[in-house]
Amino acid sequence: MDYLPLFARLNNRAVLLVGGGDIALRKARLLLDAGANLTVVAPSLHEELTELLVGHTYIPSRFTAAYLNDQMLVIAATDDEEVNAEVAAAADAANIWVNVVDDPDRSSFIFPSIIDRSPIMVAVSSGGKAPVLVRMLRERLEALLPKHLGALANLSGEWRNQIKQKLGDITSRRRFWEKAFASPQLATLLETEQHDSAEQWMADQLQADDYAGGEIVLVGAGPGDAGLLTLKGLQQIQQAEVVLYDQLVSPEVLNLVRRDAERISVGKKAGHHSVPQHEINELLLSHARAGKRVVRLKGGDPFMFGRGAEELQAARAEGIPFSVVPGITAAAGATAYAGIPLTHRDSAQSAVFITGHCKQDGEEPDWAALAASNQTLVIYMGLIGSPAITERLIAHGRRPETPVALIERGTTVRQRVLRGTLQELPELAKDAHSPSLIVIGEVAALADTLSWFGGDTASGKEHLINLA
């Protein structure tokens, strides 16, 4: 870290600005907005700067070191490099922080790009290395941060003591503020400057006093790429106090979990349940009973070939509140990253998702229906069962030459796509690792031309496409 970000209180503090032109004008606006007691030294002044300095000090002179006396900060904002260098040297000798505009090497501090939602302030800097990138980031942040953010912060400051007195424990207070800060109704009241109504909203919410109970939120983490996590999913994992996660949740998604949340790996993976389901249920319930906000984080979509419904049924039986945040399932995410459309006007009018890992005493699927030629068949957790799947599909009429694709670790930098035909599927599966998705149908051949993520896809077991 080349610079330590700091916020300086300049109200009524002495600040010296050397320069009187356009460059100095821009800095003067910032310093005056911060309440500085400004002294400007320059042979002449920009007309607008003259107006700004009413109530402040202007010295019509060239800079000398004597003007540094009693100053907290110094800004050199001239277009004369020699003068700027002289100011920097004198300030360094006097042990006063100095900024030379557009010259970080001579500066002991620099001005960041500022997004002002006072009292909320956001500062962005590249240390002078990438000013265009900083400008782009500032524009994005300006669009992202609502204009009422400052009013929201001021309102929270006004209510802080009342909330602390009413809600005795820190968990209840945090939940109150999270609800307030996420409320569309409160946001609308502040955006439209209905301050009395905003105050009443706060009073009503505080009176409700429902912030102590636990809850369970079932969140789909998506297929691997952290960019595919939904916005609501991100919000939930950043508000969680306890997170129970599967092996299929990528490290990149786990890195987005709130830092002080308790993380518990329950290790679920096809055929390998390191924590039995009844123990997972009890972990969820016990933490929720203790008043915690618990997130059950599952790979893909939580209701797609997982046991999310069973977990929520356990919560319902205990009377524990719950909610669900859907995620992008592997059938949608992995196929898209492999360049395989699930449906196509010419060859696939439907798509069917099945699991290759069923209960041992479960009924056989309808293989005749699954072998239909005008549909895409997507199989989750099908590596181990691929020989039996291949045999049954061919026996029920699916062509042995039907294109197939096996997508390993879809949407991640370690994605591999193995291409072949249905009759080659068992051999392809021998070279694949979990998690993998099997796609059977004419659309699988389109990966040859529609592949976009990391490289081209080739056919045949001998061509393992590593997209890392």
From Swiss-Prot:
**One GO term of the biological process aspect:** siroheme biosynthetic process
Amino acids binding S-adenosyl-L-methionine: P223, G299, G300, D301, T329, A330, M381, G410
Reaction catalyzed: uroporphyrinogen III + 2 S-adenosyl-L-methionine = precorrin-2 + 2 S-adenosyl-L-homocysteine + H(+); precorrin-2 + NAD(+) = sirohydrochlorin + NADH + 2 H(+); siroheme + 2 H(+) = sirohydrochlorin + Fe(2+)
PROSITE patterns associated with the record = SUMT_1, SUMT_2
A Pfam family for this UniProt protein? Sirohm_synth_M
What ranges does the record give for the region Precorrin-2 dehydrogenase /sirohydrochlorin ferrochelatase, renumbered to this chain?
Answer: 1-202
Instruction: Give the sites modified to Phosphoserine.
Output: S126
Family matches, as InterPro entries? 4pyrrol_Mease, 4pyrrol_Methylase_sf, 4pyrrole_Mease_sub1, 4pyrrole_Mease_sub2, CobA/CysG_C, NAD(P)-bd_dom_sf, Siro_Cobalamin_biosynth, Sirohaem_synt_dimer_dom_sf
Q: Which parts form a coiled-coil structure per UniProt? A: none
- Name the source's superkingdom: Bacteria
Which residues are recorded as binding NAD(+)? D22, I23, P43, S44
Keywords in UniProt for this one? Answer: Cobalamin biosynthesis, Lyase, Methyltransferase, Multifunctional enzyme, NAD, Oxidoreductase, Phosphoprotein, Porphyrin biosynthesis, S-adenosyl-L-methionine, Transferase
Q: Provide the active-site residues from the annotation.
A: D246 (proton acceptor), K268 (proton donor)
EC assignment: the record states: 2.1.1.107, 1.3.1.76, 4.99.1.4
> Where is the segment annotated Uroporphyrinogen-III C-methyltransferase?
214-468
Answer whether the UniProt record assigns the keyword Oxidoreductase to this protein.
yes
The pathway where this protein functions is: Cofactor biosynthesis; adenosylcobalamin biosynthesis; precorrin-2 from uroporphyrinogen III: step 1/1; Cofactor biosynthesis; adenosylcobalamin biosynthesis; sirohydrochlorin from precorrin-2: step 1/1; Porphyrin-containing compound metabolism; siroheme biosynthesis; precorrin-2 from uroporphyrinogen III: step 1/1; Porphyrin-containing compound metabolism; siroheme biosynthesis; siroheme from sirohydrochlorin: step 1/1
| Molecular-function annotations in GO | NAD binding; precorrin-2 dehydrogenase activity; sirohydrochlorin ferrochelatase activity; uroporphyrin-III C-methyltransferase activity
Q: Which PANTHER family match?
A: SIROHEME SYNTHASE, SIROHEME SYNTHASE-RELATED
This chain's function reads: Then it catalyzes the NAD-dependent ring dehydrogenation of precorrin-2 to yield sirohydrochlorin. Finally, it catalyzes the ferrochelation of sirohydrochlorin to yield siroheme.
**According to its UniProt record, which protein family does this protein belong to?**
In the N-terminal section; belongs to the precorrin-2 dehydrogenase / sirohydrochlorin ferrochelatase family. In the C-terminal section; belongs to the precorrin methyltransferase family.
Give the protein's recorded name: Siroheme synthase
